UniProtKB/Swiss-Prot annotation:
GO terms for biological process: positive regulation of ruffle assembly; regulation of Rho protein signal transduction; Rho protein signal transduction; sensory perception of sound. Residues 493-552 form the SH3 domain. This is Epidermal growth factor receptor kinase substrate 8-like protein 2. The keyword DNA damage does not apply. Residues 199-208 have a biased composition (Pro residues). The modification Phosphothreonine is found at residues 304, 470. The gene is EPS8L2.
């Protein structure tokens, strides 16, 4: 079996025990100090023992079945793997003494391999033939091996020529009995000492800038392409002085896109590491089958290190970057293409499934609360995941499904600052202002202030001519700041209207109660909550998922709509809609005519044999669900309807109005196929409530007209 190196999908890995950066990132003074310290600790010559920091690239068996019969064949295969980016670097230490070559674990100093000098058949350098410019090649075969192994090492801190000269001098002394090595080491020691005062020369290719990746390059696969030009519709310059200039918005989008690319690179790098660890484990088992009992198999130490799984901290880091990528996909979904955000989310959940299974289940992922998901990210996942992905998402728990705006204030979730393998540091201003960090935070002080402070806030709003009511908790509109990205388009000059699809009952003074089929004017079209104004002049916030489009003519003749339930106070001082085609006197005359016609019809009804008017009411269910129901009543209603525990758990956190506002497709996305039954039961319950409401309204209307008729009769 051949032993190929693993793929480094991200050309830049941390200088940890597994993987190392192939590019050169900008270094801080602290990083420079640490690298010099590491250089001096890793590359030392003491007496007749020298030690070098190297990266193991690959080990091949020289075998015809693997198409490797010579060193040149092995080099050719390594070049081929490098061109396809299928080489995985493994950091270790190479020690040379007068008896053997030893490979040590860079962290534990544990011996991985020990090649006695008589088993080293060949030492050679491979320079500038692949992306690793300074490579050392060793051909080793012990007495029990039928075929030799070819090992490749990248000498990233001390040139391969120096290491090669050291090994050759040790081999010459061993074979010929000469004492060449002390003189060789003396020269090398002087060169290494000189290097300790300067930064080692950069090795490997420079990192490819994310924004310049070509669509056909290997690094560009599943990556975010160029953003949508800001000149396209939807990105016109906004007229408000508070909106971001185009240049600032474009710069912010570019930074967020780069953060997203770094996160995707690190996730892909981690998945490649898992896959190559599995391959190494398989090769290790195959080699162990042919070894003698009690003796290590050839290359067993290196393969054991490669097969070592990541630590729990590294799994957590990958889960955090996955959540960060989900947040950024939702935020940039209108700005990225080739591939789109909707396509990338599926590429993200495939590796996520693999990682969850590798770490033994969702327990580690469930513990990852930082970063939380934004409201847009949760909505984005609900709208794009397929059933299998939805099940995986639900298994990860509240820290993945509950948005930041609904998360408890205590314990506080810290700001998430990712550390990328490439060494690039994301801008702090972008992270600090991100929705998944600030959503809902503006409403916290109002809840925590004293009654006196709360009263002063209300008074200041009352006396301010431009003040507007604060929206509910997660309905806060974006903060008016030149550096705040707004997720909604500016309101056009022409008035905009929407039609209410479902009844909604306000839960506080900031929300607006609306009825189905009512047409209202849009004051603010935010992300989740829209500020609307009713015909009576009342303004408040309404969830956007119960709104539908309304034509201007629908709002132009509001008093002629047959299905309209809410008319507002019919007073002579009632403010007319601007689009009403007539003056106030004509309207009042028309209303008098309508009233007279109604009185005549009611008089005719009274002349007929009297009927006992009674509204039939259905028997109430054992667990009623109304528009005033809280989460506990919703949970009780779901349990009474014998829904599964998963459905009760997912929907039991909603209030009655929130549950009634969900349509069939939204319920199917959250509940799967059982969502159809939930929708059916909600439809029945909604009809029952409407029947109750319409009955009481009709009784009240009839009583009102009856009183009016009596007064008219008395006046005449």
């Amino acid at each position: 079996m051949s032993q190929s190196g693993t793929m480094s999908c991200c050309p830049g890995a941390t200088n940890g025990s597994l993987g190392r950066s192939d590019g050169v990132a900008k270094m801080s003074p602290k990083d420079l100090f640490e690298q010099r310290k590491k250089y001096s600790n890793s590359n030392v010559i003491m007496h007749e023992t020298s030690q070098y920091h190297v990266q193991h690239l690959a080990t091949f068996i020289m075998d015809k079945s693997e198409a490797i019969t010579s060193v040149d064949d092995a080099i050719r295969k390594l070049v081929q793997l490098s061109s396809k980016e299928k080489i995985w670097t493994q950091e270790m230490l190479l020690q040379v003494n007068d008896q053997s070559l030893r490979l040590l674990d860079i962290e534990s100093q544990e011996e991985l391999e020990n090649f006695p000098l008589p088993t080293v058949q060949r030492s050679q350098t491979v320079l500038n033939q692949l992306r690793y410019p300074s490579v050392l090649l060793l051909v080793c075969q012990d007495s029990e091996q039928s075929k030799p192994d070819v090992h490749f090492f990248h000498c990233d801190e001390v040139e391969a020529e120096l290491v090669h000269e050291d090994i050759e001098s040790a081999l010459a002394d061993c074979r010929l009995g000469k004492k060449m090595r002390p003189q060789t080491l003396k020269g090398h020691q002087e060169k290494i000492r000189q290097r300790q005062s300067i930064l080692p020369p950069p090795q490997g290719p420079a990192p490819i800038p994310f924004q310049h990746r070509g669509g056909d390059s290997p690094q560009a696969k599943n990556r975010v392409g160029p953003q949508v030009p800001l000149s396209e519709p939807g990105f016109r310059r906004r007229e408000s002085q508070e909106e971001e200039p185009r240049a600032l918005l474009a710069q912010k989008i570019e930074k967020e896109t780069q953060i997203l690319n770094c996160a995707l690179d690190d996730i892909e790098w981690f998945v490649a590491r898992l896959q190559k660890a599995a391959e190494a484990f398989k090769q290790l088992n195959q080699r162990k089958k042919g070894k003698k009992k009690g003796k290590k198999a050839p290359a067993e130490g290196v393969l054991t290190l490669r097969a070592r799984p990541p630590s729990e901290g590294e799994f957590i880091d990958c889960f955090q970057k996955t959540k960060l990528a989900i947040n950024l996909l939702a935020k940039l979904q209108k700005h990225i293409q080739n591939p789109s955000a909707a396509e990338l989310v599926h590429f993200l959940f495939g590796p996520l499934d693999l990682i969850v299974n590798t770490c033994g289940g969702p327990d580690i992922a469930r513990s990852v609360s930082c970063p939380l998901l934004s409201r847009d990210a949760v909505d984005f996942l609900r709208g794009h995941l397929v059933p299998k992905e939805m099940s995986l998402w639900e298994s990860l728990g509240e820290s993945w499904m509950r948005p930041r705006s609904e998360w408890p204030w205590e314990p506080q979730v810290p700001l998430y600052v990712p550390k990328f393998h490439s060494g690039w540091e994301p801008p702090m201003d972008v992270l600090q202002e991100a929705p998944w960090e600030v959503e809902g935070l503006a409403s916290a002080p109002i809840e925590e202030v004293s009654p006196v402070s709360r009263q002063s806030i209300r008074n200041s709003q009352k006396h301010s001519p431009t003040s507007e009511p604060t929206p509910p908790g997660d309905a806060l509109p974006p903060v008016s700041s030149p550096h705040t990205h707004r997720g909604y388009q500016p309101t056009p000059a022409m008035a905009k209207y929407v039609k209410i699809l479902y009844d909604f009952t306000a839960r506080n003074a900031n929300e607006l109660s609306v009825l189905k089929d009512e047409v209202l004017e849009v004051l603010e079209d935010g992300r989740q909550w829209w500020k609307l104004r009713s015909r009576s002049g009342q303004a408040g916030y309404v969830p956007c998922n119960i709104l539908g489009e309304a034509r201007p003519e629908d709002a132009g003749a509001p008093f002629e709509q047959a299905g309209q339930k809410y008319w507002g106070p019919a007073s002579p001082t009632h403010k007319l809609p601007p689009s009403f085609p007539g003056n106030k006197d004509e309207l009042m005359q028309h209303m008098d005519e309508v009233n007279d016609e109604l009185i005549r019809k009611i008089s005719n009804i009274r002349a007929q044999p009297q009927r006992h008017f009674r509204v039939e009411r259905s028997q109430p269910v054992s667990q009623p669900l109304t528009y005033e129901s809280g989460p506990d009543e919703v949970r009780a209603w779901l349990e009474a309807k014998a829904f599964s525990p998963r459905i009760v758990e997912n929907l039991g956190i909603l209030t009655g109005p929130q549950l009634f506002s969900l349509n069939k497709e939204e319920l199917k996305k959250v509940c799967g196929e059982e969502g159809v039954r939930v929708y059916s039961q909600l439809t029945v319950q909604k009809a029952f409530l409407e029947k109750q409401q319409s009955g009481s309204e009709l009784e009240e209307l009839m009583n009102k007209f009856h009183s009016m008729n009596q007064r008219r009769g008395e006046d005449s």
